[in-house]
A protein has these predicted regions:
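A surface/extracellular/periplasmic glyco- and lipid-processing/surface-interacting theme
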Residues: 2-269
Length: 269
């Protein structure tokens, strides 16, 4: 019920459900492709789907029925869970449950691992570049999301491609993030010739925080869904805060640019 308004809700993608399987996610989507359908069926998962629940769990924004922008929130989703035979309660880890029973302890409260390895203070490696105040991520659809660093707030404000602020629908103020994470993954075409499959075991990436830039490597973690390493291969815990994560593949021409205040490209050697 704490989930804020999110959207537009679009096609479900098995990439995200696979990546976040350890988080016990509740898929929320508006339809899906065959690969996602097969994944959900294989693992006996059911999504809250706008094509099934319609306006019982989703709103369509200020558009007419011919071109709705489907959005939802935690309260709206919670209202339809019982009718879909779904629950938002966390499942108990079988191994932990067995250990508690054997030791005679009170059963542990189910938890999920953190998504990101974070810290509130502690050592950080030297940044690979300073003055990282402008960033742009180009996605395969041709759309570009931009960010500008605000030294007063220490956050990266989100911008539309034309430079206008991207407003948070819940607060009506510009969306802003403490951390920008751009993660790269090797990708290969699937047999339908249109969609891509991704390597979810490891890849490279960038971390921006406080106007600084680090080159990182990511893998699947144990204490958290992701594990990060700095340019020297040492474990890295990013600073706690609101984080934006962009996922870029290796085949579709997606790209990221990071610039200083003078417009110099910080990713060029």
């Amino acid at each position: 019920s704490a989930m804020p308004t999110v959207g537009p809700v679009t096609l479900g993608q098995d990439l995200f459900w696979r990546l976040l399987s350890g988080q016990q996610v509740l898929p929320i989507q508006r339809g899906c492709d065959l690969y996602t359908r097969n994944f959900l069926d294989y693992w006996n998962l059911r999504a809250v789907d706008a094509l099934e629940t319609g306006r019982n769990a989703f709103t369509t924004g200020n558009t007419d029925w011919a071109s709705p922008l489907w959005c939802t929130n935690g309260q709206s989703v919670a209202k339809v869970l019982s009718s879909l035979s779904l629950s938002s309660a966390l499942s108990e880890d079988p191994a932990e449950s067995a250990d508690s029973t054997q030791e005679g302890d009170t059963p542990a409260v189910p938890t999920v691992p953190a998504l990101l390895p974070q810290q509130t203070d502690g050592h950080l490696p030297d940044a690979d570049a300073a003055g990282a105040v402008q960033a742009a991520v180009q996605f395969p659809s041709g759309s570009t999301t931009r960010f500008a660093y605000d030294t007063d707030t220490g956050t990266y404000g989100m911008l539309h491609n034309d430079g206008s602020p991207q407003l948070d629908a819940n607060t009506s103020i510009q969306a802003a993030f403490d951390n920008l994470l751009v993660l790269y993954s090797a990708s290969t075409p699937r047999d339908d010739g249109r969609t891509l499959d991704y390597d979810l075991t490891m890849g490279g990436g960038l971390w921006l925080n406080g106007g600084h830039l680090w080159h990182i490597t990511w893998t699947q973690g144990t204490g958290s869904t992701f594990a990060f390493y700095d340019a020297d291969g040492r474990p890295l815990r990013i600073l706690s805060g609101r984080s934006y994560i962009a996922w870029l593949s290796s085949l579709t021409g997606e790209e990221v640019t990071v610039q200083d205040s003078a417009g110099n490209d910080l990713l060029q050697p």
